[in-house]
């Protein structure tokens, strides 16, 4: 059975935790393991933080959009902004690369996403925004023992 959710919120830092918890709550119906749930929450946090800090440069008038589809123990997520976009995607995907070293960011967001998810694709155009598509195949074992 296919199930979908769509979320839109202002690009405010305090909404990052809202997005993370909302996505985790929606995915919980598939009974993921704690590791799987933690990985998904971390990825959502990284993608939303990137949209807010880099996409909109903390301009709270921007919006972040999240779509999640659940189908056959697979989680498909799209996290999108309409912000500044990424001028050099290859460089941005390098570990430790950051455009904002003054904020003491680690530059590991895309690396974390690529390590925790089964598939990651990023589409970005300057002044048009960024769309990140993520796929995670969940184990079919139950998270809790009976």
UniProtKB/Swiss-Prot annotation:
One Pfam family recorded for the sequence: HATPase_c_2
GO molecular function: ATP binding; protein serine kinase activity; protein serine/threonine kinase activity; sigma factor antagonist activity
Family: Belongs to the anti-sigma-factor family.
Gene3D superfamilies: Histidine kinase-like ATPase, C-terminal domain
Keywords linked to the UniProt accession: ATP-binding, Kinase, Nucleotide-binding, Serine/threonine-protein kinase, Sporulation, Transferase
Record-listed E.C. numbers: 2.7.11.1
Catalytic activity: L-seryl-[protein] + ATP = O-phospho-L-seryl-[protein] + ADP + H(+); L-threonyl-[protein] + ATP = O-phospho-L-threonyl-[protein] + ADP + H(+)
Gene Ontology BP term (one): sporulation resulting in formation of a cellular spore
Kinase is among the record's keywords: yes
Name of the protein: Anti-sigma F factor
SMART domains referenced in this protein's UniProt entry, alphabetically: HATPase_c
Function: Binds to sigma F and blocks its ability to form an RNA polymerase holoenzyme (E-sigma F). Phosphorylates SpoIIAA on a serine residue. This phosphorylation may enable SpoIIAA to act as an anti-anti-sigma factor that counteracts SpoIIAB and thus releases sigma F from inhibition.
PANTHER family: ANTI-SIGMA-F FACTOR RSBW, ANTI-SIGMA-F FACTOR RSBW-RELATED
